[in-house]
Amino acid sequence: MTELKNDRYLRALLRQPVDVTPVWMMRQAGRYLPEYKATRAQAGDFMSLCKNAELACEVTLQPLRRYPLDAAILFSDILTIPDAMGLGLYFEAGEGPRFTSPVKSKADVDKLPIPDPEQELGYVMNAVRTIRRELKGEVPLIGFSGSPWTLATYMVEGGSSKAFTVIKKMMYAEPQALHALLDKLAKSVTLYLNAQIKAGAQSVMIFDTWGGVLTGRDYQQFSLYYMHKIVDGLLRENEGRRVPVTLFTKGGGQWLEAMAETGCDALGLDWTTDIADARRRVGNKVALQGNMDPSMLYASAPRIEEEVATILAGFGQGEGHVFNLGHGIHQDVDPEHAGVFVEAVHRLSAPYHQ
């Protein structure tokens, strides 16, 4: 494989010295970029874009052509695993993802296969290999998956949800059925992420988008327990260097200590968590990623720079910070504002690394 020219993102995740704080953006390949919209139109629809390795590679690289980002993230979707399990994923205009065959019972869980990452999910591995080839060692490639709990919410609810009553009903009335589903998903995610690593992903991230809707006790039992199982089963070295793992529970700032005990390398923070407080609590154990409010990108350039400066000062001197948004970039953000953000992180962070 090609020698990595810029490894500051990987170094920061391992709390090693860097020259400036590395930065990337969740959903950096996305609808805020006109070139993304053009490629998506060419593909026909979202899943066709994910399943075409050349086009998935193209949209992965688009933000890197505009901005000096320190990492690329695989262009894919968290719902690839449930789709490969045969639930019939489709997208409804204005409604988001839906499944034709949601999981309603233990019998439904028992029928679900564990997908072979190189067969049913081979299109994802093809995309990883294509992107690695085209990156030519410029920056590392991040692979990812949804967490078992987050995937289960979509599979049981039949799509997106606001109140999560269907899955919570299963959790409280039929906990064995939900545990069986989460266990199957944990095995599937472990295989899926390890296949991404073997295909060339140099770091992986687990997105627990809906962990924050749980009580503390339920979070431990139904979300964190299964992410811990995945971390335990991951390949932690490939191509002669460590493959860092980042866990991100949106709305999970109160559980950072428990998350840091999983053996992951880094924790993602959303914008509701104070980064100085997070560093005091777990900074001696894990790196931190985050955590500007994505809506700040609607602000003026000076206001964006001020916010970047505030977050950098909050983290303070030294290593172990990857700058990011606290969640995905919004689709109607001006691309120039994203450029202001990336440039400000590099310029304003240099003094913190001297």
UniProtKB/Swiss-Prot annotation:
UniProt key word Lyase: yes
Disulphide bond pairs: none
Transmembrane segments: none
Main location: cytoplasm
GO molecular function: uroporphyrinogen decarboxylase activity
Catalytic activity: uroporphyrinogen III + 4 H(+) = coproporphyrinogen III + 4 CO2
Self-association and partners: Homodimer.
Protein name: Uroporphyrinogen decarboxylase
